[in-house]
């Protein structure tokens, strides 16, 4: 299932909603083979099966879902910030170094910093340079970073 972001982080997959003769509906993922359901269906809608962080599952019509959500592998910088505010790590496909990501630090009573800040973690940096620094330091976005649509959630 692909991950998407809107006002909240959800998981979703393309699916059909079948209306059965008894008035009930059944949601079937596009890649599922359910000929017995298709044979009993009186109508079919195209859309998404959506799973929320608390496990709740629902159905969303295709147009409504695609207007509200964007896959987390092609986010704007603004959506990347929202993802960090929800506790996710983010990175850019356009960065030269692989294995690096950003996190948002929210200070607590033990922190020396008093306001939230973004930092970059380079501990997993994959590079041919044996002298490349590895660690975690505060980070500032460039104009290119802020205007890029290649941000993604790091799993």
Could you tell me what each predicted segment is?
Residues 113-147:
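Acidic, glycine/polar-enriched metal-coordinating patches/loops
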Residues 1-97, 106-115, 141, 153-155:
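Motif-centric detector for short Cys/His coordination patterns
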